[in-house]
Amino acid sequence: MRPTHWSSNQCEVDFTAEALTTLSLSNRNHEEDPIQPVLKNSNLFLLNRDIWSLIINYLDAFDILRLMHSSRQFYYWLRKSAVDECCFNNNFLNLQPYQRTVPVASDLEWATEVDLYGNPPILKLQLRDSFVWSMLAKFQGLQTIALDGTGVTISSVTNILLNIPTVKTLSIRWCVGVCSLSLIEFLQNSKSRTFSLENLYVLGVKGLELLKPVLLDGSEDDTLTSNWHSRVILFQNALDALPTTHGNPVECDISRCPLNACKIAGQETELADLFSLQKVPACIYCLREWKKPICRYCIDLRSCLVCDSFVCPSCISLDFDLQIQAFARQHRVISTLGVVYPEREDSCFHKIKAAQWHQISPRSLLFQFQEQNHIHHKKIRRKLLAAGWKWPQSQI
């Protein structure tokens, strides 16, 4: 029987330990349970870094990058910790970001296949320029080269782009030896050459890292710094001006939002979120999927909270964003109001700003917002039908 002073924290520890143990047994059949070292080091609670170290091997690239955007502590922990391996699925960004570029017999440390996941682990920082230069002859003919997490510098990147004309996808994410200014200078000085490069992934290089990750709810408090934003502009302009054989600009995982709604709302430093765009359904009007980069704030403005439909910018312009922008801001305030100030009347700062909030609870306000948004959505639907839009039978 448990003692009377048994705290609720211990119950949470037991619940978390049981859940993590079940997760580890369902994904791996190790002889040793990975939960035991953590429980020995923590008496009454599990630290965030302890939980992260347990579940990091069971997350794919999508989950890891979403955690980096939502938790600043997880971002810095991931940068400082020595993570040996992570599970990256093959559906990330519609390609295989971690492909075996060199036969295993050449260098086991470079491309060791993990039998459990079927993908090689994250590359080590010990792999530097000298090793890449020695392998340039074996890189000939490759179309995808992933140097994520290695200790290479800008010289290796330039040698690969200049000496391997067949490369179409180059990934140098989290290469701390690569400086953004050197990369921008190389792109600006290479306008006289033509490259076959189609994709360039640079998230995490020095100068282009996430200094302040934006929260999932699009909070206006954690915006990116102006210096970071100016480097993104220079890098994107230099990348767009790079001549290519296919005639299209090189796609990158770092980009700005092209719409103006986030800039009007004070979100001019908002980044385009390619991962949230993967979850966005097709446009309810033109039935086309929006492929261009768009920030999380503009996605929220163009998504109906009632029917989960999405309106692309090509169907309805900025006027649609401005009409429901007030509803979106009200929703963010109300959704957090019940957590920060649960059913408190006079102590809330937002309730002091509006007299009607003294008599309406946060839940009632949230319900009122959803009703207003639903009415607004029905009005727009009637206007578009009157203007000649052909509505799908499944959506009527």
From Swiss-Prot:
Tell me a GO biological process for this protein.
Answer: ubiquitin-dependent protein catabolic process
Which pathway is this protein assigned to?
A: Protein modification; protein ubiquitination
One Pfam family of this protein, by short name? F-box
UniProt keyword terms in alphabetical order: Cytoplasm, Ubl conjugation pathway
Q: Which GO terms describe its molecular function?
A: ubiquitin-like ligase-substrate adaptor activity
Q: Where in the cell is it found?
A: Cytoplasm
SUPFAM superfamilies assigned: F-box domain
Subunit record text: Part of a SCF (SKP1-cullin-F-box) protein ligase complex. Interacts with skp1.
**Residue ranges occupied by any F-box domain in the UniProt entry:** 40-89
Q: Which domain of life is it from?
A: Eukaryota
The protein here is known as F-box protein pof13
Q: Name one GO cellular component term.
A: ubiquitin ligase complex
